[in-house]
């Protein structure tokens, strides 16, 4: 019969065998026999089994040099570690709620009548991908350079992919934690999606919104005809970020809402100038001015009567015609500010 002191000496001697970098000695290639590498996901349970036979007098499971169980006696203070079986043929333990710090080598050590023998198994802990740091939503001016960051953790290390979610079909994919955009354009605004993938679980996906500011551009401003006594409506549509503010002028006079039978309504990209009862004096050239913090632009629009000769082109085709008038209007705007 073995004295307890002998067992202590045995375990201490066995522990010396597991110095990092030193191969584990094993007297018999088939005894004891532990499992191959065990792979589990973070949060799951891991079962470590060791096959033994009736030659075994003492058994123990160790994590590196720390004894977890010696026979039925628990040495570990970790309540997640429990013994499953201690029979003549198998000695196994279970680790509940496995975490990344549980990863590493585990050793089944046995004492026979002759000498200690060991067998090792490596526990691999897989961790689902998780994005741990990502850029906040950002607003920049057109032409600026932008860097978006998306840092992810997981085991195996996840692959990080950036994708532009564009409704115009101009989306692109970049496989890197950092996405760099040089000279950003208004078409590159919108949501950017970061995905972290490692095949352990579903990808972790998060989004960043990129807003690109740009000066106003008048996209629609058409001449309009109306008879005396009828309603006439001039429309001016401008694209801009931030949204443009509109002003209306006749020649060099700024029009005020509600005066002289006109109403000015501006909502989003569209501004309208409405004449409720058109008179002869209302006919003529009007200028729509769209302004935001990055700049301004203007378009000339004509309200004409029946039979009048007019240019029905859009705002772009009439830009040169309004140049002199715009110089006058700009001077007036500067005085107003």
Curated annotation (Swiss-Prot):
Known tissue expression = Restricted to the nervous system.
Q: Which residues are glycosylated?
A: 133, 277, 285, 298
The function of this protein is: Inhibits neurite outgrowth.
Q: Where is the lipid attached (GPI-anchor amidated asparagine)?
A: 314
Q: Which residues form the propeptide?
A: 315-337
What subcellular compartments does it reside in?
A: Cell membrane
Signal peptide stretch: 1-20
**S-S bonds:** 50-108, 150-194, 236-288
Q: Give the superkingdom in one word.
A: Eukaryota
Tell me the membrane topology, using the record's own terms: Lipid-anchor; GPI-anchor
What would be the name of the gene that encodes this protein? OPCML
The protein's UniProt keywords, in alphabetical order, are: Cell adhesion, Cell membrane, Disulfide bond, Glycoprotein, GPI-anchor, Immunoglobulin domain, Lipoprotein, Membrane, Repeat, Signal
Q: Which GO terms describe its biological process?
A: cell adhesion
Q: Which InterPro entries match?
A: Ig-like_dom, Ig-like_dom_sf, Ig-like_fold, Ig_I-set, Ig_sub, Ig_sub2, IgLON_domain
One Pfam family it belongs to: I-set
Q: Which organism is it from?
A: Gallus gallus
By sequence similarity, the record places it as follows: Belongs to the immunoglobulin superfamily. IgLON family.
Give the SMART domains listed for this entry.
IG, IGc2
Q: What is this protein called?
A: Opioid-binding protein/cell adhesion molecule homolog
Q: Which residues form the Ig-like C2-type domain?
A: 32-119, 129-211, 215-302
One GO cellular component term of this record is: plasma membrane
